[in-house]
Every structure is written in structure tokens, then in C-alpha cells.
């Protein structure tokens, strides 16, 4: 059931902890919001012509999404104050000495930066969440917070701008989702024409949908409505949700700009902004869209940013849009794979990959409880591999950008529920899909960089579980051999001698002269060996399934 579609009459009587019928502290003002005011102290000189708070010019001079938006001059406006500091330090937390906190952070690999960073919590109760949130947590069976949650919750609940850096699968979504619910419940109720109070920007539709699912679970008790705004589907239902009014909007940048451009919603009420997987959004070229969107939001908002990595581009975005932020990093900033994942890298010829995959899949699926995610470099190869596996008796399904959204949703559901044990995907799924119970990841094609390799294999071995990742490495990938060996060594994995030799001969940047050494056959396309068979064929998910082997 989606709470965003409900019409509320205000007759909900679930009062608790001093909250009104919507779970919110009473507030009188409704449509009296001014659209301006700022934090003051704006500085010139930031990248791309933006000042300290991202007040820019360049991105408004081009056509495309958001071309009709007018950049707001916040310095000449007055903003009505809002509440954002809800953190009350628990007695147990307060009584811990600095030495104990330092030791605990060291044990959990938590590193913090900034002034007056709150101490980490160790339980849900210590985080200071209201009873209605704690009840949802207990009902859903959560036992203990993850390290990123332990430190991020007191940071976000205190109303500070913050950056959280942690590996995929570490619980980042709840790190901002639960504080967002508390934030909403302390704001005045929405009035007709109001936009959302919380805005979450995400790089992919799949990730946006998963965030929405978490928001729905934990917003249920206080009837917080949400909607998910992304491309590839009709705008009508999304427009309907926005017009009816939602407290939370989870969106991909392009579709949200489309909605803003056509006056289907506004961001005047946004006081809690989340940039999730910021590094991925920048990798996908969303920086201009992000800047246009954020410029429409009052600058005294609370902004939280989460990322799996901390490159210079993400650091610049944080400097431009976060005010006096504090930062938590869990684990090393160096690129590293989870030690819960067994990494098996095989050096093979391009022409042998398909046969190798068939052999490995047969071995893996001897256990019917296993769930396999296969990554390919292109949509064509994803479809080819899906057909190959189905013809071999394995009920594989493919997901990539050329599939219609309803088909993608169906494939995800089939995979998530275990009806299909194999999903073949392009990188649209590498960081946007969170499916529990993935036991094996296959890199049929090695990605363009080792960072994507780490994110791909991070689909397994999540939340303390064990996982296995198979990778077929060819001479085409030689320039990444040295970095891959480093990742394998750090995780104490066995290394194929052929890969070590490839790394020695590789320049690490241009591929070296290794291809002259004879491992590759040359002339084959990446993911090749198929020739021109099935060229132009579509509908891989409807390819005939041979006599089932599963």
C-alpha cells in the first residue's frame, strides 16, 4: 500500500509523544512562506562560476532540462525559521569518555572530520528517535545499527549539514531516512500548492524506487506521503502525486527538472535535502541538473550528502552546497572491496567467456538457494547472454536501459522473489539495485574502471553476509590489471598468475604492450565471440526457455 495516494481528513488519532494527528508538533503558519533569505556571507570564486552556496550562472545559459527556471536571488529574501535540531544526547552516550569514543570509532573504522561532531550511538534507543520510529524499527526486525548509522544519526538529527562516506550495502539509506521522518513531523502541515519538505536526489530509477520503499515503511505510522519521480514512465501519476501533496519526493535529476520547468511542483518548502550516491550522480553527468535544482531551494536548509567515494568532484560539490559541514567516513577512503566477498578472477580469451560462464553457472546453481547477478558491458551483450542462458535451460532475465520501465520492474521483482535466479544487467544496476540475498556476482565484461568493479561486486556480501564474485578478465582489460591486483591483494585474495604477469607488463594507464604477449586473440570485440548472430533481435526476456535445469 502506498500512503502517497491516500486522502487524509485529519481524523487520524494516533497521537504520541506530543505529536498531533499527523505525528507533527503543532505549527500555525501554512502558506506564509517567503521564497528567499539566505545564510549570508556568500563568496565568489567557486568552480563553474558558482559562489559558496552554488549561486551560479553558467548552467542557466544553456537549453535542456530546467531551461525555463529562473535562478533565485536568496540574498534579498527573508526566510521564516524552521526547526531542524532534534538531537538529545542519551545518558549512555553522554557518560562515555572521549577515550572510549575514540576506541569505539577505531574498532568500527569510523573517522570524523569537523567541529563538535556528536559522539556515535550504539543502539536505536540511544539515537533519540521518537517512539513511533522505534516501533517501526522493531516491527521490521532490525537488531542493531550499522557503523555509518551509529555516527550519521546524531549528526543528521542535530540539524547539521553532513557528508557520509561508506561502502555500498552499509545502510546509508536509513542514515538519512529516519532523521528525515523526524524532521517532517516537526514542520507545519502541507497546504494546497506546497511542494515537498524532504527532497532526495538519486542517480537511477531503481535506487529511487528502493529509497521510496524504505520511506514508505518508516513513514507509515505518521502517515507521511511520498512519491518517486523518474523518467521512462508516464508523467501523469507522478504529477497527480505532486499536486495532491507529498512530504517526501525521491527523484532523479532530469525528471524533477522537467516537473519544475512545467510548474508541476516547487521546492519552496524543502528544508531537508539529500544527495544520495553523489559520486554516481556526478559520474553520470548530472552535475548541471543538480546545481539547477539546488539553486531552487532555500539556502538555510539542512543538506546531507552520501557517497561511496570521495573524489575531488564530490568534494567540490560539498563545498559549494553544504554549510560548515561535518563528515563521517566508515572504512578506508582508498578503493577497496569488502572482505566478505571471495573474488575469483580468471584470465580468459574473449571467445571462451560464454562457455566459461555456462560452466560456472551450472556449478553455482547446484544450490537452488543461490541468486546470481551478471554484469555485461553493453545492452547487446546483456541480451545475448540472457538468450544463451535461457537456451541452456536457465531462467535468466535481463535489465538495461532499453527495457521499458514496467518490464524492468517486473524483472526486478522476479529476481528479488527468487522466481528467476539469474539477472543479467548493464551498469544501470551496479549501484542502483539493492536486492537482498545475492550470493554471486559475475563480471562477464570487466567494467571501464576498478571503482565500478568494486561497486559491482558490492551487490553481494552485504550486511555481514558472505558472497562470491567471478570476473572474466581479458587482454582488452590489461590496463586495469595493476589496480585490480592491488584490490585483490588488499582483500587477501588468491591471484591468477596470468593476471600478475599481465599487471607487470601493463602500464596501468594505456594497456602497455601486454597484448603482444599472446593471451588475447585480437580483433574480438569486448564481450565478443558471438559474431553477428541475433543482430537486431529484441525481447531477450521472452526468448524460449529450453528444458529447465533449475
From Swiss-Prot:
EC numbers: 3.6.4.13
Class in the EC hierarchy, top level: hydrolase
Keyword flag Coiled coil: no
GO CC annotations, alphabetized: cytoplasm; cytosol; nucleolus; nucleus; ribonucleoprotein complex
Entries under SMART domains matching the protein: DEXDc (SM00487), HELICc (SM00490)
SUPFAM superfamilies: P-loop containing nucleoside triphosphate hydrolases (SSF52540)
Binding site for ATP: 166-173
Single GO biological process annotation from the record: alternative mRNA splicing, via spliceosome
Claim: Transmembrane is one of the keywords in the record: no
Keywords: ATP-binding, Cytoplasm, Helicase, Hydrolase, Nonsense-mediated mRNA decay, Nucleotide-binding, Nucleus, Ribosome biogenesis, RNA-binding, rRNA processing
Domain Helicase C-terminal residue range list: 340-503
Pfam families per record: DEAD (PF00270), Helicase_C (PF00271)
Motif (DEAD box): 276-279
Helicase ATP-binding domain segment(s): 153-328
InterPro entries named among the record's database cross-references: DEAD/DEAH_box_helicase_dom, Helicase_ATP-bd, Helicase_C-like, P-loop_NTPase, RNA-helicase_DEAD-box_CS, RNA_helicase_DEAD_Q_motif
Compartments in which it is found: Cytoplasm; Nucleus
GO molecular function: ATP binding; ATP hydrolysis activity; mRNA binding; RNA helicase activity
CDD domains referenced in this protein's UniProt entry, alphabetically: DEADc_DDX5_DDX17 (cd17966), SF2_C_DEAD (cd18787)
Motif Q motif mapped to chain: 122-150
UniProt note: domains: The Q motif is unique to and characteristic of the DEAD box family of RNA helicases and controls ATP binding and hydrolysis.
Subunit structure: Associates with polysomes.
The protein's role, per its UniProt record: ATP-dependent RNA helicase involved nonsense-mediated mRNA decay and ribosome biogenesis through rRNA processing.
Family in the record: Belongs to the DEAD box helicase family. DDX5/DBP2 subfamily.
Protein's recorded name: ATP-dependent RNA helicase dbp2
Source organism per UniProt: Schizosaccharomyces pombe (strain 972 / ATCC 24843)
Gene assigned in the entry: dbp2
Amino acid at each position: 500500500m502506498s500512503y502517497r495516494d491516500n486522502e487524509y481528513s485529519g481524523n487520524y488519532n494516533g497521537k504520541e509523544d506530543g505529536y498531533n494527528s499527523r505525528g507533527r508538533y503543532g505549527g500555525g503558519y501554512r502558506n506564509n512562506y517567503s521564497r528567499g533569505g539566505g545564510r549570508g556571507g556568500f563568496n565568489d570564486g567557486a568552480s563553474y562560476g558558482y559562489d559558496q552556496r552554488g549561486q551560479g550562472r553558467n548552467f542557466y545559459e544553456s537549453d535542456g532540462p530546467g531551461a525555463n527556471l529562473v535562478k533565485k536571488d536568496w540574498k534579498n529574501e527573508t526566510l521564516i525559521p524552521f526547526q531542524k535540531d532534534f538531537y538529545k544526547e542519551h545518558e549512555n552516550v553522554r557518560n562515555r569518555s572521549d577515550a572510549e569514543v575514540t576506541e569505539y570509532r577505531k574498532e568500527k573504522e569510523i573517522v570524523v572530520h569537523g567541529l563538535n561532531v556528536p559522539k556515535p550511538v550504539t543502539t536505536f534507543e540511544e539515537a533519540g528517535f521518537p517512539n513511533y520510529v522505534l516501533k517501526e524499527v522493531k516491527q521490521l526486525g532490525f537488531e542493531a545499527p550499522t557503523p555509518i548509522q551509529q555516527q550519521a544519526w546524531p549528526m543528521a538529527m542535530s540539524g547539521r549539514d553532513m557528508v557520509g562516506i561508506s561502502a555500498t550495502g552499509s545502510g546509508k539509506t536509513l542514515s538519512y531516512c529516519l532523521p528525515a521522518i523526524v524532521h517532517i513531523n516537526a514542520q507545519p502541515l502541507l497546504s494546497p500548492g506546497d511542494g515537498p519538505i524532504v527532497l532526495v536526489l538519486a542517480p537511477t530509477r531503481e535506487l529511487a524506487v528502493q529509497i521510496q520503499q524504505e520511506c514508505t515503511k518508516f513513514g507509515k505510522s505518521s502517515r507521511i506521503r511520498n512519491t518517486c519521480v523518474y523518467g521512462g514512465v508516464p508523467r501523469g501519476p507522478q504529477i497527480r502525486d505532486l499536486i495532491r501533496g507529498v512530504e517526501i519526493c525521491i527523484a532523479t535529476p532530469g525528471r524533477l527538472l522537467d516537473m519544475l520547468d512545467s510548474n508541476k511542483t516547487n521546492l519552496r518548502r524543502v528544508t531537508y535535502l539529500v544527495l544520495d550516491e553523489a559520486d554516481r550522480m556526478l559520474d553520470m553527468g548530472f552535475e548541471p541538473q543538480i546545481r539547477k535544482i539546488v539553486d531552487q531551494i532555500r539556502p538555510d536548509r539542512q543538506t546531507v550528502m552520501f557517497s561511496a567515494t570521495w573524489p575531488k568532484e564530490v568534494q567540490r560539490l560539498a563545498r559549494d552546497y553544504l554549510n560548515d559541514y561535518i563528515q563521517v567516513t566508515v572504512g578506508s577512503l582508498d578503493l577497496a572491496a569488502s572482505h566478505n566477498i571471495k573474488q575469483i578472477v580468471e584470465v580468459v580469451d574473449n571467445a571462451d567467456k560464454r562457455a566459461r560462464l555456462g560452466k560456472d553457472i551450472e556449478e553455482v546453481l547446484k544450490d537452488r538457494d543461490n541468486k546470481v547477478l551478471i554484469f555485461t558491458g553493453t545492452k547487446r551483450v546483456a541480451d545475448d547472454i540472457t538468450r544463451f542462458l535461457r537456451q541452456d535451460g536457465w531462467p535468466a532475465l535481463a535489465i538495461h536501459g532499453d527495457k521499458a520501465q514496467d518490464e524492468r520492474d517486473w524483472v526486478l521483482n522476479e529476481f528479488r522473489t527468487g522466481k528467476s535466479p539469474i539477472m543479467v544487467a548493464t551498469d544501470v544496476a551496479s549501484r542502483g539495485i539493492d536486492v537482498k540475498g545475492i550470493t554471486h556476482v559475475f563480471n562477464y565484461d570487466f567494467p571501464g574502471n576498478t571503482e565500478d568493479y568494486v561497486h559491482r561486486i558490492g551487490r553481494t556480501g552485504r550486511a555481514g553476509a558472505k558472497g562470491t564474485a567471478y570476473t572474466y578478465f581479458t587482454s582488452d582489460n590489461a590496463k586495469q590489471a595493476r589496480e585490480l591486483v592491488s584490490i585483490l591483494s588488499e582483500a587477501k585474495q588468491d591471484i591468477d598468475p596470468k593476471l600478475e604477469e599481465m599487471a607487470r607488463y601493463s602500464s596501468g594507464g594505456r594497456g602497455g604492450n601486454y597484448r603482444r604477449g599472446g593471451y588475447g586473440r585480437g580483433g574480438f570485440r569486448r564481450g565478443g565471440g558471438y559474431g553477428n548472430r541475433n543482430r537486431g533481435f529484441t525481447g531477450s526476456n521472452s526468448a524460449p526457455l529450453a528444458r529447465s535445469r533449475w
